């Protein structure tokens, strides 16, 4: 949603005459198999404020859209043969990466920055399943890759896997069998990764259908998985007394994990009135309460402090 409860919608199209009314960066089809698209419409869904295509000469698709508190727009998608097309004003990038994140201006008239990530082989590595921009503008991605599953859909068996994706030191799981989930946090200016890890079983074809996972605003992902296919039980479970630590199916079984990426959040916003020689200066706390256990600390600079909400 936009600042005024307006709506952003994204997707993909193979139509060379897909309508893109209003303001927007790209007004013509980029060529190739598909282009991504993004629409900004009013809250009643009867006026298009702006719209843009997002694509070049191969396969391009937008999966998710998020906005921040300034109304800036972030999209996550896949791209084949991306080369350096999606790299602009971003220190962290992978030329020819199979996934891209773009930060648009509010009116979709241009990019603030854009980057591609992945192995850099010119094909998509993961299917995105969840996307978040948190209150501090950190960018969260969840997705899965599996050559074995994608081969069943007719793709070559040597593409669309998780091997070779960047992970960070001390991450939860640093190795992959190429058929796992991938969790990532990117810095708000695309200068680097704050955290990245694999999660999945070894020698298992872990995957999921779309629309089955979410991040909350604190960066916790709730992810459903088609796990432990082949009647194994190697997908990690926790704690030991969880509902079902083993796979009780004779093939795949549904698994749900809640993973806290544990990035510290300092959330603050203030309203300070203008004045001169005020005897009393009221402070109004406009911080967004993301948890009932949130703590507040005021330091007035004169030795006085407060924990009032």
Please identify what each model-predicted range represents.
Residues 1-277, 284-299, 303:
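A sequence-level/structural motif corresponding to short, flexible coil/turn segments enriched
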Residues 303-309:
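Short beta-strand segments within Ig-like beta-sandwich modules, predominantly Fibronectin type-III
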